């Protein structure tokens, strides 16, 4: 989570949940900064079981979104999911590689605003 205040509120509300404050667009640096998500400099990736993102990715330039997706897929175990919630009509990030599979949920109409979940996987 980017907001320190929101992290504090989440930590108080969910004391058993690890909450990490940082910038998702500097994902590896943020994950190395604390919480034990990535260990040390020798951990070069392929160690995470999944990533769930709900930030408004369509507000960022396509190049920034692609950089984040590529970094996330490098940090994930082969075939592990990167999930992106989106309210937009278009795919939030178009992968650079055919090695990345993309699947989407149906529209979730009970959510306001309606949303879809996009699932990206590499090496699956």
Residue spans of the language-model regions?
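Conserved acidic E/D residue at the C-terminus of a beta-strand in Rossmann-like folds
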Residues: 1-2
